[in-house]
Amino acid sequence: MTTKNIMTSGVYTLKPTDTVAHAMSLMHKKHVRNLPVVDSKGMFIGLFGLRRLSHLLLPIAALDLGEHSLSELHFLPDEIVQMGDRWHEIANQPVSDFLEKKKKLLFCTPDTAFPELLALLDESKDSSLPVIVVEGDTKQLVGMVSGWDVLEGIIMGNLIKGANAGQPSADNE
């Protein structure tokens, strides 16, 4: 099985000029955690999602924790008002201003083998990966794949059928 067997095509996308507020609204309305950002030709530019949005709303002091745990944030005097202020600062800015530029964004291709896909999803900090067709310097977005797609692929592909032979099903318990 490869990524093309389980990926979601025809995904919702953002333009680089779309605002953070628009992105948040679309994520909420469509119940998705990540939205790929593409140019006018459908070429992949980056990914904007809830993880990035959460990072933008954190107090600056929280970003300087380094190796310390986020559970140590109780000392910050931040209130919802300050978070609202940070939201108003970024809401009307384009998502292109906040795409991850420092790290290499992980992606897969339609032909990525299932074991490699599992490893990429495990390595990724996001809950989904863009599926890209790479031709030279261009990266054409053709879909997205998530942990839920993998789960559905395992169940629908009966990959676990043999592993459960002779075991009672959940329906029989």
Task: Report the location of each language-model feature.
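Short beta->alpha transition motifs characteristic of CBS
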Residues: 32, 44-61, 126-127, 140-158
